[in-house]
């Protein structure tokens, strides 16, 4: 499992004093209010202030004191140590842990690897790339087992649930 988890991406500058606008990669933006530090390119940075906006977060990060400096951080990921992440309820997983999981069906046939997790509102959908691309709804009727340690996701055979 990855030691660091991405919680946001710097998408723009905000103002002239070095604040950055962050697109959250977490389900709960309020978590940013509790963050004391993040890692950018592996370097620890202290968070000095946090303002929540409807779809973004504005952060003042130590060492970023001008719009020019803030501009250098565009498209950079903000990461936290896994040990500082929220504790997930049983049956929930971090997207970072699902990416690159091998997907097999209950008969042992290789389907491919999870390349992305699409958030749809009602349920997640796993984008699985193999011989072809398959979109797998992440629901209990289809996904029968997730083994993060062994990077394996087991699903019901495609012919049972997939329309031709």
Curated annotation (Swiss-Prot):
Description of how the protein assembles with itself and partners? Binds ribosomal protein uS19.
Free-text comment about domains: The PRC barrel domain binds ribosomal protein uS19.
Keyword rRNA processing set for record: yes
Q: What does this protein do?
A: An accessory protein needed during the final step in the assembly of 30S ribosomal subunit, possibly for assembly of the head region. Essential for efficient processing of 16S rRNA. May be needed both before and after RbfA during the maturation of 16S rRNA. It has affinity for free ribosomal 30S subunits but not for 70S ribosomes.
Subcellular location, record wording = Cytoplasm
**Keywords (A to Z) from UniProt:** Chaperone, Cytoplasm, Ribosome biogenesis, rRNA processing
Q: Which PANTHER family match?
A: RIBOSOME MATURATION FACTOR RIMM
Q: In this protein, which residues make up the domain named PRC barrel?
A: 90-161
Species this protein is from: Clostridium botulinum (strain ATCC 19397 / Type A)
Gene Ontology terms describing biological process: ribosomal small subunit biogenesis; rRNA processing
User: What domain of life?
Assistant: Bacteria
| Family, per entry | Belongs to the RimM family.
Q: What is this protein called?
A: Ribosome maturation factor RimM
Please provide, in alphabetical order, the Gene Ontology terms of the cellular component aspect for this entry.
cytoplasm; ribosome
Q: Which GO terms describe its molecular function?
A: ribosome binding
């Amino acid at each position: 499992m990855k030691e660091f988890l991405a919680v946001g991406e710097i998408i723009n500058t905000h103002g002239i004093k070095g604040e950055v606008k962050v697109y959250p990669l977490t389900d709960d933006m309020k978590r940013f209010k509790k963050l004391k530090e993040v890692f950018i390119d592996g370097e620890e940075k202290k968070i000095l202030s946090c303002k929540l906006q409807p779809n973004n977060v504005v952060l003042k990060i130590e060492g970023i004191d001008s719009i020019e400096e803030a501009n250098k951080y565009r498209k950079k990921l903000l990461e936290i140590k896994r040990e500082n992440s929220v504790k997930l309820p049983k049956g929930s997983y971090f997207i970072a842990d699902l990416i690159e999981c091998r997907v097999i069906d209950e008969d042992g046939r290789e389907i491919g690897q999870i390349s992305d997790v699409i958030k749809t509102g009602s349920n997640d959908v796993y984008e699985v790339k193999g011989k072809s691309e398959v979109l797998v709804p992440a629901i209990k009727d289809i996904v029968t087992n997730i083994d993060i340690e062994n990077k394996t996701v087991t699903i019901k055979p495609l012919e049972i649930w997939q329309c031709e």
